[in-house]
Curated annotation (Swiss-Prot):
Name of the protein: High osmolarity signaling protein SHO1
Transmembrane segments: 33-53, 66-86, 94-114, 123-143
Lineage, top ranks: Eukaryota, Fungi, Dikarya, Ascomycota, Saccharomycotina
Organism: Saccharomyces cerevisiae (strain FostersB)
Reported function: Plasma membrane osmosensor that activates the high osmolarity glycerol (HOG) MAPK signaling pathway in response to high osmolarity. Detects changes in external osmolarity and activates PBS2 through the stimulation of STE11 and targets PBS2 to the plasma membrane. PBS2 activation leads to changes in glycerol production that helps to balance the intracellular and external osmotic pressures. Activates also HOG1 in response to heat stress and mediates resistance to oxidative stress. Involved in the regulation of the mating pathway. May be a receptor that feeds into the pseudohyphal growth pathway.
InterPro entries linked to this entry: SH3-like_dom_sf, SH3_domain, Sho1_SH3
Length: 367
């Protein structure tokens, strides 16, 4: 049996967890940007509707299309509050941005018609729609940007829940790891510290700066005694096997006196082989390599992290693990974008670092 048939990733069906989207007012109260901007929008809308009603009640002419713009703005404000209460803002970002852009056009058009009109009542209505236009422009900047953008990160830093996860940033990290994965035996990546020591580290986490022809990210514990960190892994392994075959054949010729014993010795070369540094049990699969993480002691998981958001592992990635919001995870490595972690049920794998927060003591677990 060849080595290529021995080292294969063991598929794992990750658990899928549903995110809670029930109606909760605390989702709205926990976001200072939502409270402040929507409160200002409500005040501006009251000024606009009050001035419009006062102007229309007199004999003064009033632009009729402004009424639809005011009603449309009211629907936008109500929709935003509902999206926050059900925690669906990230799911409807495109809809929110486009609908607010339409409201911006309506209010700007109404301001053009009212700002040049005479009378204090129309002046109040024009002030209201101008304020609404400014707020709509701020909303377009926020909801139109990704959560990883500098402005969104700065605004979300004041939120009680912290910075929102970025789907774009997450997909770039996954694409980077998938792009480094090849089909040769030693190129099935188990994401670990070797990615930083292999000589192919990148300056930007989103895209590789240098794409190696071979990547050697197999656990050094599983391959103790015959690992090779040079790029030409397959050639090095072939040379190593040839040398072992010559040594075993020489020993077999000296000991064995019949052809049956020689055939048995040659057959065992493809299955297992011993080196001066091995323990005689080097028959390891990629599934066993993943299993080694389950045997790591508690001392190696010296950090604890609290999940800020629920995370569903990617179906195409056997090494990610899912976790729930506020779940406490044990972490063994806190460098890079993806951390090695272990759940309370013993499940181990990698997790995105921007979904969790390190905690120092038991009092932070209940925050």
């Amino acid at each position: 049996m060849s080595i290529s048939s021995k080292i294969r990733p063991t598929p794992r069906x990750p658990s899928r967890m549903a995110t809670d989207h029930s109606f909760k007012m605390k989702n709205f109260y926990a976001d200072p940007f939502a409270i402040s901007s929507i409160s200002l929008a409500i005040v501006s809308w009251v000024i606009a509707i009050g001035g419009s009603i006062s102007s229309a009640s007199t004999n003064e002419s009033f632009p009729r299309f402004t009424w639809w713009g005011i009603v449309y703005q009211f629907l936008i404000i109500c929709s935003l509050m509902l999206f926050y209460c059900f925690d669906l803002v990230d799911h409807y970002r495109i809809f929110i941005t486009t609908s607010i852009a339409v409201a911006f056009v309506y209010n700007t058009n109404s301001a053009t018609n009212l700002v040049y009109a005479d009378g204090p009542k129309k002046a109040a209505a024009s002030a209201g729609v101008i304020l609404l236009s400014i707020i709509n422009l701020i909303w377009i900047l926020y909801y139109g940007g990704d959560n990883a953008s500098p402005t969104n990160r700065w605004i979300d830093s004041f939120s009680i829940k912290g910075i929102r996860p970025s789907p774009l940033e997450n997909s770039l990290h996954r694409a980077r790891r998938r792009g480094n994965r090849n089909t040769t035996p030693y190129q099935n990546n188990v994401y670990n510290d070797a990615i930083r020591d292999s000589g192919y580290a990148t300056q930007f986490d989103g895209y590789p700066q240098q794409q190696p022809s071979h990547t050697n990210y197999v656990s050094s514990t599983a391959l103790a005694g015959f690992e090779n960190t040079q790029p030409n892994t397959s050639e090095a392994v072939n040379l190593h096997l040839n040398x072992l075959q010559q040594r075993i054949n020489s020993a077999s010729n000296a000991k064995e006196t019949n052809d049956n014993s020689n055939n048995q010795t040659n057959t065992n070369i493809g299955n297992t082989f011993d080196t001066d540094f091995s323990n005689g049990n080097t028959e390891t699969t990629m599934g066993d390599t993943l299993g080694l993480y389950s045997d790591i002691g508690d001392d190696n998981f010296i950090y604890k992290a609290k999940a800020l958001y629920p995370y569903d592992a990617d179906d195409d990635d056997a090494y990610e693990i899912s976790f729930e919001q506020n779940e406490i995870l044990q972490v063994s490595d806190i460098e890079g974008r993806w951390w090695k972690a272990r759940r309370a049920n013993g499940e181990t794998g990698i997790i995105p670092s921007n979904y969790v927060q390190l905690i120092d003591g038991p009092e932070e677990m209940h925050r």
